[in-house]
């Protein structure tokens, strides 16, 4: 076989192998059945300890308070309530996001109180030190009272208060911006006759693993945090395997940060994160309580000494919402989504989005894609425009590869003559071929580059489409309402023309009866092959014949945005290769190659045509 076909088969086969490995390593996430619902537990979060001699124990069980003992949360993007029991932020839903494409479906609920399946909440408090005991400071079961009245809203903070009856008055003022950032100011007024010591803390607790946990290898779900510039990601299974720490009374990992950081729980699209004051030391804790099946992320700030008659205040923040790129970036760079006096930037907050191994590609790719979507107004068209930009970026390298492929065609007569002279002497054949390539300045491996260069770009774009919320429920045109999901159409019901429904996504039937977009992908790959005639070797010809259709089924369950990218990429590659081949005197017989692919017996090629490997003879140039 000629080297061009050999290289093309090698590159295509490698791409196929990589996608196969990807398919088996990263299978589609399994849907959670109703039977897998975790039974709610009444156990609450484990209170932290500030000093080695202060024991860490689980807070006793509690009962939920009636709705009248809650403070309503109502902002343009959030709705929910704060429980007066412990002052917990434990009821929060995102107004801008629905569970499904149906606008009448339920909005996404992020936080839920104890007593419901998979309780998920944020809790603040103080850890006692010195002469103080846990009964002297507010905890998970402290009943707070609201100072004044009214709901928590943008520019409408609420204040909670608790008096321990021993001279200490605790106040908690909670405010929220127009996106997803809560500010929590905790104060303690010392009206006793002696100085007291105590330390503020924040906890985000999850009872059991999330119901919709995808357990996808390529996706991080679990604890995410940053301390002094170092990002840490710990999946739920790994949290449950942490070593037992006696001082914590649980399995835990404790990190002391000196300058900045944050910690919390991240899902695919949502996140709840504790953000202490930046520029000051704090302790970051990841914890698991096996008996109660509670996962915790904690921040503990420095011990505070409050003199008699004095008041101490500590402020922190809580992010609870969608991982929108612009929003997260604004918090990282400016500390707020709008210019706000005193707002502290949050270093490294953009890394709470799971950019993956190819972060050096996924970050710039998404940045450009987001800008294109903002300019065009349609994510599908933005993906198409991004494909053109990426192809333009790699055009110089691709051009050299296509030129090398065209020169390889010119060498076919000389290579055939070499084969006849060398006979069975493979060493002689190899030596003469290398001499010929060097003499003609041809790189036989250059034909692999156009295909191989797509692999990291393909995987990076896959990651972007899979994890960024901007692609969630992003429509294109027609039947493609969600570019982050597979093509919903199906051959089974003739693409919606038949009166019966398409197979359920994720089932074997859905993998077999693919949609219109994967079929277009197969056709685009098949058309790209027709720039060259089928190889003379039967094994090669069979590989070439089956490859487009194998890829068609392999990628049929991938996100439609990714399949759209590959289709456009194939069409651009086809056009580039066709133009470059013609510019070097080769005229691909596309229709002839298509016709030959349907004939049972390959027609004998004229000598002149065979010499050019299916291309029309080049015209002689005038000297």
Swiss-Prot record:
Low complexity: compositionally biased ranges: 601-617
Main location: membrane
GO molecular-function term, one example from the UniProt record: membrane insertase activity
Transmembrane annotation, as ranges: 8-28, 379-399, 449-469, 507-527, 543-563
One of the record's GO cellular component terms: plasma membrane
Keywords: Cell inner membrane, Cell membrane, Chaperone, Membrane, Protein transport, Transmembrane, Transmembrane helix, Transport
Gene3D superfamilies tied to this protein: 2.70.98.90
Subcellular location: Cell inner membrane
Keyword Metal-binding among UniProt keywords: no
Biological-process GO terms, alphabetical: protein insertion into membrane; protein transport
InterPro entries, per database record: Membr_insert_YidC, Membr_insert_YidC_N, YidC/ALB3/OXA1/COX18, YidC/Oxa/ALB_C, YidC_ALB_C, YidC_periplasmic_sf
Region annotation Disordered: where it falls in the sequence: 601-623
Pfam families per UniProt: 60KD_IMP, YidC_periplas
Keyword Translocase: no
Described function: Required for the insertion and/or proper folding and/or complex formation of integral membrane proteins into the membrane. Involved in integration of membrane proteins that insert both dependently and independently of the Sec translocase complex, as well as at least some lipoproteins. Aids folding of multispanning membrane proteins.
PANTHER family per the UniProt record, alphabetical: CYTOCHROME C OXIDASE ASSEMBLY PROTEIN COX18, MITOCHONDRIAL (PTHR12428:SF65), OXA1 (PTHR12428)
Protein family according to the UniProt entry: Belongs to the OXA1/ALB3/YidC family. Type 1 subfamily.
HAMAP family: YidC_type1
NCBIfam families: PRK01318.1-4, yidC_nterm, yidC_oxa1_cterm
Protein's name according to its UniProt entry: Membrane protein insertase YidC
Source organism: Cereibacter sphaeroides (strain ATCC 17029 / ATH 2.4.9)
């Amino acid at each position: 076989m000629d080297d061009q076909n050999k290289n093309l088969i090698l590159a295509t086969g490698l791409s196929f192998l990589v996608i196969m490995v990807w398919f088996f390593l990263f299978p589609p996430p399994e849907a959670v059945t109703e039977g897998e619902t975790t039974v709610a537990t009444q156990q609450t979060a484990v209170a932290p300890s500030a000093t080695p001699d202060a024991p860490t124990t689980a807070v006793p069980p509690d009962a939920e308070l009636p709705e009248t003992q809650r403070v309503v949360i109502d902002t343009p993007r959030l709705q929910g309530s704060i429980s007066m029991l412990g002052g917990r932020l434990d009821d929060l839903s995102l107004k801008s996001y629905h569970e499904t494409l149906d606008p009448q479906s339920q909005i996404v609920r992020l936080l839920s109180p104890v007593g419901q399946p998979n309780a998920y909440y944020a809790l603040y408090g103080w850890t006692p030190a010195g002469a103080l005991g846990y009964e002297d400071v507010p905890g998970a079961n402290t009943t707070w009272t609201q100072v004044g009245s009214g709901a928590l809203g943008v520019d409408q903070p609420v204040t909670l208060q608790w008096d321990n009856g021993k001279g200490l008055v605790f106040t908690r003022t909670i405010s929220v911006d127009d996106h997803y950032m809560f500010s929590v100011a905790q104060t303690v007024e010392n009206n006793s006759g002696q100085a007291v010591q105590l330390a503020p803390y924040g906890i985000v607790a999850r009872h059991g693993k999330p119901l919709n946990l995808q357990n996808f290898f390529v996706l991080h779900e679990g604890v995410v945090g940053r301390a002094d510039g170092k990002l840490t990601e710990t999946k739920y299974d790994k949290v449950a395997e942490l070593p037992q720490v006696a001082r914590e009374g649980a399995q835990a990992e404790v990190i002391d940060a000196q300058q900045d950081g944050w910690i919390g729980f991240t899902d695919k699209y949502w996140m709840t994160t504790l953000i202490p004051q930046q520029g000051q030391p704090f302790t970051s804790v990841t914890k698991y309580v096996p008996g109660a099946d509670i996962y915790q992320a904690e921040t503990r700030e420095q011990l505070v000494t409050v003199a008699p008659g004095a008041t101490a205040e500590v402020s922190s923040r809580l992010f609870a919402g969608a991982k929108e790129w612009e929003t997260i970036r604004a918090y990282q760079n400016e500390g707020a989504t709008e210019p706000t006096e005193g707002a502290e930037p949050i270093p490294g907050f953009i890394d709470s989005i799971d950019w993956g191994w190819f972060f050096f590609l996924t970050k710039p790719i998404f940045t450009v894609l987001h800008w294109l979507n903002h300019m065009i107004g349609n994510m599908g068209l933005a993906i198409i425009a991004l494909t053109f930009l990426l192809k333009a970026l790699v055009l110089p390298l691709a051009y050299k590869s296509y030129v090398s492929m065209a020169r390889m065609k010119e060498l076919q007569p000389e290579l055939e003559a070499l084969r006849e002279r060398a006979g069975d002497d493979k060493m002689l054949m190899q030596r003469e071929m290398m001499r010929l390539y060097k003499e003609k300045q041809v790189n036989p491996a250059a034909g692999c580059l156009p295909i191989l260069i797509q692999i990291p770009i393909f995987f990076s774009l896959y990651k972007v489409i899979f994890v960024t919320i901007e692609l969630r429920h992003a429509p294109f045109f027609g039947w493609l309402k969600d570019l982050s999901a597979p093509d919903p159409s199906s051959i089974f019901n003739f693409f919606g023309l038949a009166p019966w429904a398409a197979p359920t996504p994720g089932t074997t039937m859905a993998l077999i009866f693919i949609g219109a977009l994967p079929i277009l992908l197969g056709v685009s790959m098949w058309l790209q092959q027709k720039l060259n005639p089928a190889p003379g070797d039967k094994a090669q010809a069979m590989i070439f014949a089956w490859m487009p259709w194998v890829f068609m089924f392999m990628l049929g369950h991938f996100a439609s945005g990714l399949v759209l990218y590959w289709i456009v990429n194939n069409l651009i590659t086809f056009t580039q290769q066709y133009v470059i081949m013609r510019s070097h005197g080769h005229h691909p017989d596309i229709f002839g190659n298509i016709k030959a692919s349907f004939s049972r017996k390959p027609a004998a090629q004229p000598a002149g045509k065979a010499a050019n490997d299916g291309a029309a003879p080049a015209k002689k140039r005038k000297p």
